[in-house]
Structures are given as C-alpha cells and as structure tokens.
Regions:
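Second-shell loop/turn segments in exported
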Residues: 26-31, 41-45, 81-89, 105-116, ...
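Export/targeting segments at the very N-terminus of extracytoplasmic proteins
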Residues: 17-76, 131-134
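Catalytic and substrate-binding regions of cell-wall glycan-acting enzymes that process beta-1,4-linked
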Residues: 83-85, 139-191
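Extracytoplasmic and endomembrane cell-envelope/extracellular-matrix remodeling and assembly machinery
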Residues: 17-39, 43-46, 167, 171-202
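Short, surface-exposed glycine/acidic/tryptophan-bearing loops
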Residues: 69-101, 145-147, 165
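Alpha-helical segment that forms one wall of the substrate-binding/catalytic cleft
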Residues: 91-143, 147-155
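Sec-dependent bacterial lipoprotein signal peptides
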Residues: 1-16
C-alpha cells in the first residue's frame, strides 16, 4: 500500500472511532450511549469476575474514554520534542510491555489498545492478576488503581507512599467507582433487557 493509501486508511479509522461519551459522569448514560461498551463490560465481568464499575472508573482516570490517548510530548528547551513520558496508549493507557504480556498470556494477537472491548478486557485481566498476586479485592478500586499505576512489585514495596499525589488520585478513582456502582444499580435491569424488548418497549 502506498503512502497515500495509508494516510487514507488512517483517516478512515479515525473517523470510525467512537468519540468519548457525552456524559462521562454517569455510568448509565455512558452505556446507554454506547451499548457495545456495556456488552464489553459484561464480558469482562463474566470472564474475570471484575465488577463493571471498577475498570470504568479507572478508565475515566486514565484516558477520559479517548481511544487514542497518550502521555503528553516532552520538550527540550521548550520546543524540541524528545519523546513521551511512557509508552502508555489507548483507552486503558496500557504500556507496551504490559500489553504485550497480556496479549501473549491470553493469545490475543489481534487485540488493540485503541479498541474499547480489548482495552476493557486488558483492565479486567490486570485487576484479576492484582487480586492473584497481591490479594487486592477486585472491588477495591483504590487498591486496584495503585497496583495499576505502580505495578505489582511497586505496590508490594509501597512505592505509592512516596507519592501523595497518587494517593489522592487513587481516592478520586475509588470515589468515582462508588458513584458509578450506585448509578449502575439504578439502570442495570434496563441495560440487561434484550434487544427485542428494547425494540418494542423502548
């Protein structure tokens, strides 16, 4: 494929990408706007035993639900770019090395960090592993986010104690997770209705 074709393909894929939800503060509205996201979240719940609201609260913090989110570019002398702070990318802000571990361990070579379902499954896997490795409850958004940010070894070594800002961010993630959980209880029955029921009864 020539360069023009590659540019065209990139523009097409960008145009097809799902925009961030209009109301990211409300989990019910997020899933009502993007029914496929709810299906992906339920698949993660069934596969990894992870409650719907925890990875969604973490994803809000990581990318604000932007498919192509990246850390900001760093500049030398204020104008010479010299790379980004990390290889984090996509909905889950998964770093390349950790993503590659996930892909290899789960035989998902087709998975993409810019795909919501893949990124959500990655988060479910990471939360599951954090529970296995460090004994952190899958429902504990605070502890799970610390694992997610610091890695399993960093969490065991309590590296977060030297980062007061990270503890504050993790508390915000936990607060959001609790709000999302309360909202989800109000709309789960409606979201779980079959497509046929929604077709006839709205």
């Amino acid at each position: 494929m020539n360069k023009l074709g590659l540019v065209g393909l990139a523009l097409l894929l960008t145009g097809c990408a799902t925009p961030p939800p209009k109301d990211p503060e409300n989990l019910c509205n997020i899933f009502k706007e993007n029914r496929s996201w709810y299906k992906a979240a339920k698949n993660t719940e069934q596969k990894w035993g992870v409650p719907v609201h925890v990875p969604m609260a973490m994803m809000y913090q990581e990318s604000s639900f932007r498919h192509n989110a990246r850390p900001p570019m760093r500049y030398f002398l204020g104008f010479i770019p010299y790379g980004r702070a990390s290889t984090a990318y996509g909905y889950a802000q998964a770093k390349t090395m950790t993503w590659d571990d996930y892909v290899r361990e789960n035989n998902r070579s087709w998975a993409r960090r810019s795909n919501f379902a893949d990124a959500h499954d990655f988060m479910g896997w990471f939360i599951y592993k954090s529970h296995q490795v460090n004994g952190v409850s899958k429902w504990d958004a605070y502890g799970q986010y610390l694992n997610y940010h610091e890695g399993w070894g960093g969490y065991r070594n309590k590296s977060y104690n030297a980062k007061p800002w990270l503890i504050q961010v993790s508390r915000r993630v936990d607060d959001r997770s609790k709000r999302y959980a309360a909202q989800y209880r109000q709309c789960q029955k409606d979201l779980d209705r079959s497509w046929l029921w929604r077709l006839f009864f709205g």
